[in-house]
A protein has these predicted regions:
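Generic surface-pattern signal
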Residues: 8, 12-15, 19-26, 46, ...
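Short secondary-structure boundary micro-motifs
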Residues: 43-47, 145
Length: 194
């Protein structure tokens, strides 16, 4: 519970900081100018003001759990794939191997990443429905084949699977198959689907 509360508070603080930096960076001569194009800052500001949902984020915290000191943040990554498969799936398999197969009961995996991703897809779909008056008919999950390790494809495939489990129609597409429909100003996949 402490780690979840701390993470929620840190996430809210990060959003507040992003709003502050976005506002300040638009002021002439501001020392907080990050060199981000004005249009991108304005889009981010609208998104922050609307409280658009994000899919997931990851904190790197330092916390011993037994010295009375609160958790402290080392790093924050939002909507980036690093470590997602390991945290959501491999930790579950470790839990099964160490506890369940040994007959230990009453202990659950301490994170609920997989379940929360599925729930968050539902919230995102609802948000897009309210925002645009309709829900997307298909979610496209794009990956690059330039990643020799396969991590990008594995992570993208996993995220797509969680969206499917949330009841969303989804497809996997290579980045190089993405195009732009100039008439509708919408992105398309290799099959010319929006």
């Amino acid at each position: 519970d402490l780690l979840e509360r701390t993470s929620e508070n840190l996430h809210m603080m990060a959003k507040d900081a992003a709003g502050f930096l976005a506002e300040e960076s638009l002021k002439p001569g501001s020392p907080f100018n990050l060199g981000i194009p004005r249009e991108a800052i304005e889009y981010a500001t609208v998104s922050l003001d609307r409280d658009d949902p994000s899919l997931y984020s990851r904190f790197d915290l330092i916390y011993s759990g037994n010295d009375g000191r609160p958790p402290r943040m080392l790093e924050y990554n939002a909507d980036t794939p690093t470590g997602l498969v390991e945290a959501a799936l491999i930790q579950w398999y470790w839990h099964e191997d160490v506890h369940l197969k040994a007959g230990v009961t009453g202990i659950d995996q301490w994170n609920g990443i997989h379940e929360e991703l599925i729930a968050q897809w539902g919230r995102i779909d609802d948000h897009l429905g309210r925002l645009h008056g309709l829900r997307p008919h298909m979610y496209h999950f794009a990956y690059t084949d330039a990643d020799d390790s396969g991590e990008d494809l594995m992570t993208t495939g996993y995220l797509m699977d969680t969206a499917i489990q949330a009841g969303l129609t989804s497809t996997l597409v290579e980045m190089k198959q993405l195009g732009l429909d100039r008439e509708t100003a919408r992105f398309t996949d290799g099959k010319n689907r929006h």
